[in-house]
Each structure stands twice: as structure tokens, then as C-alpha cells.
Amino acid sequence: MKTVCYIAHPDVNQSSSQQYLLESGLNYSQAQYVNLYEVMNNLVIEQEQDRLLAAEQIIFQFPMYWYQAPGILFEWINQVWSTLKPSQLKGKTLGVVVVVGGKKEHYQSGGREGRTVSELLSNFEVLARHFKMNYKPIFAIHQFQYINEQQKAHLMWRYLFYLETNEEERLTNYQRFIIARAKTLISEEIATDHNLAPLWQAFISQLEMQEFEIEELMGINLEEEL
């Protein structure tokens, strides 16, 4: 899947969250990244439209500012999307990756903010609907500055899953993705060091066994519900 990820952040180099996401995507996915602050300095609308039309999946990535996306994203949409016809983007996928400074529990019914992140950013769902695009559930990252290394590793895999698939983030789909990506990475490692082959193969076998056990457990739970 050809994914183009548009970053709307005024200083990506000084943002630990954006740097982590960018490095993860560049190193472990085929996604193309576009910095909107750089693009808008010398905007060529035809080139931007060509890039959109060539993509299968379009991702907007940004920090939440006052319950919305940064203004530059809307400025870019206004200039680049306004002359496009819905038929030109029909069937493509639109997704949103948003970094939120507040706690997750604040953004829900009864929480401090009283609205979910999806509700606050519902304008992007309307945009996708207008252009007859498929809209993915929002990928929200809360309080990145407080998560530990293990949580960051989990975040990286979830982020790659979001970038590279249109599947629902169910446990079985997610685990299959990790196994497939791990096999790719492992084959690259083995190509440079054949001594690693037995260790990597054992790792893959363990993942596949866990996948089987999870699928079996989910099947039992489903039968119980029925």
C-alpha cells in the first residue's frame, strides 16, 4: 500500500514524539513523509495534487492545538484539495495520527474535556465522506513524554500497523502483521550474519505459536458468547 503521511508540526526536529514516529516510519515502513511547513514555503499545487492522486492512503499527522489540528493543515487542504473532484480521491483511505498532551481519560464523555478526540476531529471524517474516501479510526497518542521504552516499542508496532494496513486493530490482525514484518526484518539480518538464523527462527516460531493460542482462545470466547 502506498501511504503518504503529511506532518503538520512547526519544528519536527525539536519534537520527541514526531521524531520517534518519523524514524519508525522511515526505518520500518514504505510510507512517504511530507513536511507541510516545508511544502507551504514553495507550494506547487499541481505537484501536491499529483502526489495525492498517486497515493492509496493519506495520513494527516500532527499535535493537537486547542482541540484541533494546526492551521497550516487547513491552509494546505484549502489550496490543494479545493479544485479536486470527489471522483479523483474515491476509494482512497484517509487517516489521522494525533499527539495529545492530555490524558486519555480526559477526552471522553464525563471527562474533563467532555468530548472524545474523534468527536473533536470529526471534520476530517466529513472531509473523507465528501471525497468518497474510506476513513480510518483516529490513531491518538496521549502524553508521549511520559511513556517508557517498552510502551514506545508497542507504540511503534501499532503505528506501523496503522501506516501499512487498512485492517481493524484486532489482536489477531495485529499479531499477524508483527510476524510478517518480523520475518522481513529477520531475513535482512540473516543476510548479513548467518549465525543469527537459528535464534531468529526460534523467535518467529514462538510468535506463531502465540498467534495460534490467541486465535484458539478467541474462538472459544466467541462460542461462549453465542
Q: What are these regions, as identified by a protein language model?
A:
Residues 40-49, 148-150:
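Structural motif
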Residues 83-104, 201-226:
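Ser/Thr/Gly-rich flexible loops in soluble cytosolic domains mediating phosphotransfer, phosphorylation
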Residues 118-138:
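A charged, well-structured terminal subsegment
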Residues 1-31:
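N-terminal beta1-alpha1 ligand-phosphate binding loop
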Residues 47-124:
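Helix-loop-strand module that forms the ligand-binding subsite of alpha/beta enzymes
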Residues 22-26, 133-223:
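Glycine-rich phosphate/pyrophosphate-binding loop and the adjoining helix
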Residues 28-42:
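A short beta-strand-loop structural module common to alpha/beta enzyme folds
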Residues 8, 36, 99:
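Cofactor-binding loop segments of dinucleotide-utilizing enzymes, especially the Rossmann-like FAD-
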